Amino acid sequence: YTLELNGDTVSADNLVIASGGLSMPGLGATPFGYKIAEQFGLKVLPTRAGLVPFTLHKSLLEQLQTLSGVSVSSTITAEDGTLFRENLLFTHRGLSGPAVLQISSYWQPGEFVTVNLVPDCDLDGFINEQRAEHPNQSLKNTLAMQLPKRLIECLQLLGQIPDVTLKQLNSREQQALVDTLTNWRVQPNGTEGYRTAEVTLGGVDTDELSSRTMEARNVPGLYFIGEVMDVTGWLGGYNFQWAWASAWACAQALAQK
């Protein structure tokens, strides 16, 4: 292999591509690795941002603007059934937090995600219990035992939480409230893209490489490791581990040559 680097020429028997993906271009991310793969005839799968915050349509974002900085426990489900139980964070651009970052890797443009904002509570049963013990307690104060005050105030302004006591809350209103808080369907406008994405989905097709050495099956001496490959993990260090593990496998193979 011959490389031209700033006017210098370097020759090597083996070439290892560890250039990463497209995430966080401000740190120097480029499509260099994908271009090398394509130059040698390897298949590169379509790329997109992963582990990335959602942006929201303007109308919904305006409704939720007072919630920026509010974090809640949640479960979030993609249309393919993938579910994560993590914290969700409202931001000035849309939705973030571990729950959203995780589900973003399973979301496709145009799809909805479904959010349960009270995953640790049987909300219908909780309201019934509170009504039996404190019938004159306001619905707002009852929900404040489970949700942040700012979220309750926002939902009140949007007409999602009636300004009533528990004994005044009728069954239709209660069911609508429970559905709003446990089955909130959101259609993201998109994501924040590679600028803030922690990983890149897609990349060099793993079928093109040896799973033992990371060497291209049909191009001897050419190796790909880390995020440039079509391998994406969850939050929690899995992507770091993949980078280290694939590098170790490649290094072992090179040492044995």
Predicted feature residues:
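Conserved beta-strand-loop-beta-strand element in the redox core of flavoprotein oxidoreductases
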Residues: 1-10, 15, 72, 78
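Short hydrophobic core segments
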Residues: 9-26, 37-38, 88-93, 222-224, ...
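Glycine-rich loop(s) and the adjacent beta-strand/alpha-helix scaffold that form part
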Residues: 14-60
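A conserved FAD-binding loop/helix module that cradles the flavin
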Residues: 22-40, 231-257
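Glycine-rich nucleotide phosphate-binding loop and flanking beta-alpha elements
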Residues: 22-25, 97, 107, 212-213
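Glycine-rich phosphate/pyrophosphate-binding beta-alpha loops
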Residues: 23-24, 53, 91, 95-98, ...
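An anion/pyrophosphate-binding glycine-rich loop and adjacent beta-alpha core
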Residues: 42-48, 52-172
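A glycine-rich dinucleotide-binding beta-alpha-beta segment and adjacent secondary-structure elements
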Residues: 153-232
